[in-house]
């Protein structure tokens, strides 16, 4: 399991030092696309932060595939600081809690899907991002949007 890898833990430790300086007094964060490379690392980093810091951040981790979440995050599925949301972004956000910060990493970035269905792929990514922005606007949250080079 990646979480138990010594090198991975060392990397989390180094990134943790940087994270302490940028989190400030934030108390809650929603991360979308948590089964992707960047999103899964960010969730592990926030869990590491909560385990090693004297303050706790409430983490909301969102992805559409419950099975992938359970496989990737089996080490934290029962962690009280992490709340998993199983949702596709083709619908409005189903998180009633207020979050201060949203890191939006979810998108349909599969080249094969884009090649077959370019318009619907683009529209789905736009619609998902719009739902994130609406949710943020209604709750006064800040949004950080990042993606791979494969987003359309």
List the predicted regions and their residue ranges.
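Non-catalytic terminal and boundary segments that flank Rossmann-like NAD(P)-dependent oxidoreductase
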Residues: 1-30
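N-terminal Rossmann NAD(P)H-binding glycine-rich loop of SDR-like oxidoreductase domains
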Residues: 28-48
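Conserved glycine-rich Rossmann-like NAD(P)H-binding loop of the short-chain dehydrogenase/reductase
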Residues: 51-69
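Adenine-nucleotide cofactor-binding loop residues
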Residues: 67, 90, 127
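Short, conserved SAM-binding/catalytic segment
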Residues: 67-81
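NAD(P)H-binding glycine-rich loop region in Rossmannoid oxidoreductase-like domains
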Residues: 86-124, 135
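Conserved Rossmann-fold NAD(P)-dependent oxidoreductase catalytic core, especially the SDR/UDP-sugar
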Residues: 104, 130-152
